[in-house]
C-alpha cells in the first residue's frame, strides 16, 4: 500500500529553504535558530510574496489530489498511523517525583536564630 502523502510546505517554508544558504553566507557565525529568526524578519519585510504563495498553492492542490487518491485506495487502515501521536507527547510520561520537604525542625531553628 502507498504511504500517506506528506503535507505541503507553506509559502514561508518554501522561501526559507531557498534563502537559507544566502542567509548563512551573509551571517556565517549564525546558529540554526538565528538563521530561522533572521529568515522570519526578512519574510515579514518582503513586499511581494506572490511567487512563493503560488508555489505553495500548487503544492497544496497536488497534496489534496494525492490525499483523495490515498483515501480512495483504502487510506492507512492497517498501520493506524492517523491515530498515532508523534513526538514527545506520544511517549508515556512517568508521574512526577514528590519533592522532599525541608524538615520543619530546620525551619524552627532558623526562626530561633534570628
From Swiss-Prot:
SMART domains named among the record's database cross-references: HMG (SM00398)
Record region (Disordered):
69-114
Under the heading PROSITE patterns, the entry gives: HMG_BOX_2 (PS50118)
Acidic residues bias: start-end ranges: 105-114
Q: Can you provide one Gene Ontology molecular function annotated for this UniProt record?
A: DNA binding
Question: DNA-binding region spans which residues?
Answer: 5-71
Q: Which domain of life is it from?
A: Eukaryota
**GO biological process: what's one of them?**
regulation of transcription by RNA polymerase II
- GO cellular component, as recorded: chromosome; nucleus
Give its localization.
Nucleus; Chromosome
Annotated keywords: Chromosome, DNA-binding, Nucleus
Q: Name one Pfam family in it.
A: HMG_box
Primary site of residence: nucleus
What is the protein's known function?
Answer: Found in condensed chromomeres. Binds preferentially to AT-rich DNA.
Which family is this sequence assigned to?
Answer: Belongs to the HMGB family.
Name this protein carries in UniProt:
Mobility group protein 1A
**Species the sequence originates in:** Chironomus tentans
Q: Which gene specifies this protein's sequence?
A: HMG1A
